Swiss-Prot record:
The gene is aroC. This is Chorismate synthase. This reaction introduces a second double bond into the aromatic ring system. Keywords: Amino-acid biosynthesis, Aromatic amino acid biosynthesis, FAD, Flavoprotein, FMN, Lyase, NADP. Transmembrane segments: none annotated.
Length: 370
């Protein structure tokens, strides 16, 4: 199986399966000399880990990260950093009924057709369990970006099923299990999820991710544009069915006089471009939206086929998230960080000495909405 590595200079290769002994990532290309301990990584893993509320999977995994290499006396050495997370709460017997059948909406059928073998236990390699090492690697990337440029990467849920979650304040996000930036709507979201769980069904979500204090100039046109690589990384996240940068699909309805963000000496008037023009960062906030589909594993019986092609009915008994989008925010943050750090190193390699006389304008003109 190929396709397990993200990045060009700062690379992340993940390994493991949902019900194997461990999962992990090898981070290569991290610059030497950065302070790094497990504690720098654990915070983001704790935000993503299962079993943190009644609204997510009840699989109890501590997700304690171990740094096996690439760090000496508390500093990165420039050699590959191996991050290991041991699986401790597998319940493979829950999947005995799908050994010979394919779950609708899952990778069961496609993995079988492509490889001729599949690990049916919790989805194996295709499980969202494999996002844990992505988050661990992303924490390393976040730390480097923060120390080099003051870059801050944050995310929140803006929609749960049919319920819009209006943005109020960033301070609300860590205070609820939905990563909602609006505390007032949390009771409604909890009632909604309780009803969904009783019905044995699932729902999708929309996630917003914002990177602030991003340097100007990141991105490699034409085919390694920054927005193209962001979309590529985000589409590698389980259950993502759509990615928008900036105004996204709303751009279709806008006139050019509205969409084109005007430049002034005091800053940009608007950010419909989402912080990227011509595939290169402008220094404005990079804004990304993700559409996440409903969880395919539900208790409701579904029609399918078995390996022989015969009709079959599939019921899923494992422990699953009624909405995988609830835990997706820290994963999306990690992916954005990984793309940005890779492009920061690529920019430094080719254009680090480039100087122009034109001053860099502020990301936002005074009086413009944030």
């Amino acid at each position: 199986m190929s396709g397990n590595t993200l990045g060009l200079l700062f690379t992340v290769t993940t390994f493991g399966e949902s019900h194997g002994p461990a999962i992990g990532a090898v981070v290569d290309g991290c610059p030497p000399g950065m302070d790094l301990t497990e504690a720098d990584i654990q915070g983001d893993l704790d935000r993503r880990k299962p079993g943190t509320s009644r609204h997510v999977t009840q699989r109890k995994e501590p997700d304690q990260v171990e740094i096996l290499s690439g760090v000496f006396e508390g500093k990165t050495t420039g050699t590959p950093i191996c991050l290991l997370i041991r699986n401790t709460d597998q319940r493979s017997k829950d999947y005995g009924n799908i050994v010979e059948t394919f779950r609708p909406g899952h990778a069961d059928y496609t993995y079988w057709q492509k490889y001729g073998i599949r690990d049916y236990r919790g989805g194996g390699r295709s499980s969202a369990r494999l996002t844990a090492p992505v988050v661990a690697a992303g924490a390393v990337a976040k730390k480097w970006l923060r120390e080099q440029f003051g870059t801050e990467i944050r995310g929140y849920m803006s929609k749960l099923g049919e319920i819009e979650v209006p943005f109020s304040d960033w301070s609300h996000v860590p205070e609820n299990p939905f990563f909602a930036a609006n505390a007032d709507i949390v009771p409604e979201l909890e009632t909604y999820m309780d009803a969904l769980r009783r019905d044995g069904d699932s729902v999708g979500a929309r996630i917003e991710v914002v990177a602030s204090n991003v340097p100007v100039g990141l991105g490699e046109p034409l085919f390694d544009r920054l927005d193209a690589d962001i979309a590529h990384a985000m589409m590698g996240l389980n259950a993502v069915k759509g990615v928008e940068i900036g105004a996204g699909f709303k751009s279709v309805e806008q006139r050019g006089s509205e969409h084109g963000d005007e430049l002034t000496a005091q800053g940009f008037r608007g950010n419909n471009a989402g912080g990227i023009l011509g595939g290169i960062s402008t220094g404005q906030d990079i804004t990304v939206s993700l559409a996440i589909k409903p969880t395919s594993s539900i208790r409701t019986p579904r029609e399918s086929i078995d390996k022989a092609g015969n009709a079959a009915t599939v019921e899923t008994f494992g422990r699953h998230d009624p909405c995988v989008g609830i835990r997706a925010t820290p994963i999306a943050e990690a992916l954005l960080a990984l793309v940005l750090v890779d492009h920061a190193l690529r920019h430094r390699a080719q254009c680090g000495d480039v100087k122009v006389d034109t001053p860099r304008i502020p990301a936002q003109a005074p009086g413009q909405p944030g």
